[in-house]
Amino acid sequence: VEVVNVELKIRNILTQGPTVEVPAKVDTGATLLVLPQSVVRELGFPTIRKQTVKYANEERADREIVYGVELEVCDRRGVFEAVVEPEKTYAALLGAVVMETLDLIVEPRDFRIYPNPRSKLPMAEIE
């Protein structure tokens, strides 16, 4: 099975810090945005709670949830919470919450995502 990969622009909206580009896997079966601990530390996102998460293999673990993650992808932008994953083998995981909020569609034939052309969401202007 092929994987859809994207580049995310992420910054801490609470500190108005720098924007970093982070590669991510798009996972329509995942619910939340997941970031590696290294990115969370680099950008200084605050932990707002701990939450039990369930993985695809049915394992459960307690993970920190951070806030203030401003994320831009496909010229769409929003602020999200993210699960902190201490030992990730990939940079980030883009789940359904971000996809739905930003009204993005997965194109499985081309292995990409794009904004819903019928969306009523405004497009972000990129300078």
What are these regions (language model features)?
Residues V1-E127:
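Pepsin/retropepsin-fold aspartyl endopeptidases
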